[in-house]
């Protein structure tokens, strides 16, 4: 167990995108906001929508809906920035519809995916949270690493939001 995991045991960041609830491990959260201004990067391609400056760092901003194969619903009402443990260079921001907040979710309420390479209806799926209503737990660490390396094949799995 890492120090970050010990500081935030069983804690997850919850957000809404396209009317659906998603979550990821809170230990990866660097910042969450209801709005962050960013400079758009037109015609850049891919899922990069812009860049922003936060706490003296330039942060790329990606379209989370596009990464998950969903239809983009502008304008975003929320922003989350993720930083991978032990790396300063893998700081990435994402547009989301709404930042809900933190949730304590006991391990018994999480159904992990058996195999990370299994074909799933949602790119970057790590598991399912079964707390009242079932919603996806995303593998943000894998998502950020793949986007940073240019390996975006997992984000092309879906072509429509009906799968989410």
Can you name each region flagged by the protein language model?
Residues 1-164:
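An acidic, low-aromatic, low-complexity terminal/linker signal
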């Amino acid at each position: 167990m890492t120090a970050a995991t010990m500081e935030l045991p069983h804690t997850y960041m919850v957000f809404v995108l396209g009317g659906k609830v998603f979550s990821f491990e809170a230990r990866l959260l660097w910042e969450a906001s209801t709005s962050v201004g960013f400079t758009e990067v037109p015609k850049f391609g891919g899922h990069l929508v812009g860049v922003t400056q936060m706490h003296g760092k330039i942060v790329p901003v990606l379209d989370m809906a596009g990464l998950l194969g969903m239809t983009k619903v502008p304008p975003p009402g929320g922003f989350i920035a993720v930083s991978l443990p032990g790396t300063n260079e893998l700081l990435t921001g994402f547009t989301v519809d709404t930042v809900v907040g933190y949730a304590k979710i006991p391990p018994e309420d999480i159904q992990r995916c058996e195999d990370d390479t299994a074909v799933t209806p949602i790119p970057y799926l790590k598991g399912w949270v079964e707390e009242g209503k079932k919603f996806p737990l995303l593998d943000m660490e894998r998502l950020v690493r793949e986007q940073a390396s240019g390996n975006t094949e997992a984000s092309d799995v879906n072509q429509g939001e009906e799968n989410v």
